Amino acid sequence: MELLLKYFPTLTPTQVAQYTQAVSLYEEWNARINVISRKDMEHFVLHHLLHSLGIAKIHPFSVGLKVLDVGTGGGFPGIPLAILYPEVSFHLVDSIGKKIKVVQEVATALGLTNVTSEQARVETLEGQYDYIVSRAVTQMADFYKLTKHLLKPVTNKGDKRGILYLKGGDLTEELAAFPSATVYNLSEVFEEDFFETKKVVVL
C-alpha cells in the first residue's frame, strides 16, 4: 500500500486494511470470474485503485453526497472511492450480472455499508445523484445523454453537481460539444508513467 500512502498519507489504518484486503479479494474473484484482465491484475493497485482515486485528487467529495457509478464493471471507480469516503453514499451499476455479483461480494467483505449495487442499464435507472462517476464507458456525448436525468437539479447557488469521467487520449474532438467541460491531466497529480495520457473530465 506504499503507492496509495504516497499520495494519500492521511489514510486511516482501517482504510489501509480495506485497500489491502481488496487486492486479495479481487485476485480471488478474478480467478473465478474474469472482471479484470489477468495480465492487468499484476498492476492492480496502480491501474485500478490509484487510477480510481484520481477522481478524489481532482474533485474531493464532502460528507453526505450521493454518487452514482455507471458501468462500474468489477467496482471501479466506486469501490476505491467508497473506501476513501465512508460518509458518502455510492450506488454502483452495471448491465452484466456476474460483475455486479463481484461488486456485492467485495463490498460486503470489506464492510462497505455506504455501497449499494444494481444490475441495470443506465437508461432504466431512476433517482437523483449529486455526482455521476465512470471510467471510459462510452463517448461523452452518449454518456451525458444517458445520465443527465440522474443528476440532482441545482437549487441553491452553492450547489455542486456534475459528471466526473476517467478518460484517456486526445479528447479535443469528443468534448467539442461541451465547452463547459474541464479536463484535468492525472500526470500532473501522479508521477507514474501509466498516467501520462490519463485524464479526469469534469462536466
Where are these regions (language model features)?
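Conserved SAM/SAH cofactor-binding pocket of Class I
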Residues: 53-134, 144
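Non-DNA-binding regulatory cores of transcription-related proteins
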Residues: 120, 147, 166-169
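Active-site capping/gating segments
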Residues: 169-203
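N-terminal auxiliary segments of SAM/dcSAM-dependent transferases
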Residues: 1-38
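Conserved beta-strand signature within the Rossmann-like core of class I S-adenosyl-L-methionine
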Residues: 155-171
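Conserved alpha-helix/loop element of class I SAM-dependent methyltransferases that forms part
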Residues: 28, 32, 45-63
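Conserved hydrophobic residues forming the short capping helix/wall of the S-adenosyl-L-methionine
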Residues: 30, 106-107, 151
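A short, conserved alpha-helix within the catalytic core of class I
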Residues: 140-150
